[in-house]
Amino acid sequence: MKAPFLVAVSLHQTNGSLTYTSALTDYRKYVMPVRPFTIALRGMYYGRFGSSAEDARLTPVFIGYPDLVRGYDYNSFDPLECGNTTDGSCPVFDRLLGSRLIVGNAELRFPPWGAFGGSSFYGPIPLEVALFADAGAAWTRQRPLRLTGVNRDLVRSVGVAARINVLGFAVA
């Protein structure tokens, strides 16, 4: 049996006081090499193009959301990380913002009760644990993507996550 996958492609045109096109490509693949372990892979690209794609009235895209690259949320930075800049910017944080982004995620998911010999697949609590690795980058036309060198834009994180399902919905 082939492993399930999902591909979403979207183009959206905005016309009015702002004119730009947004493009989204999202690819996901799920493989269960041995029950109850599942490998989940995801690659995503989003970009805004056109004359107003980087207009100051638009909120920049941000790769630090938990469903993109975990561990880089707005409150995870100390002001000391920004260094002394003359314009008040924070280069460490600014690399998470742009009009385009690319993200890759990999997870090994399993229910701990079922993985460690429990008689029931999920056990008394519908808990799922995931070991994850995330990576991503955001950029603009004025600040092109740099994947090499000292000032590269790629951010990465690894860790452990847990989810509890209630009536089929992940709640934590």
Model-based region annotation:
Residues 145-172:
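C-terminal structured "cap/appendage" subdomains that terminate the fold
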Residues 1-135, 139-149, 153:
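C-terminal outer-membrane beta-barrel translocator/porin domains of Gram-negative envelope proteins
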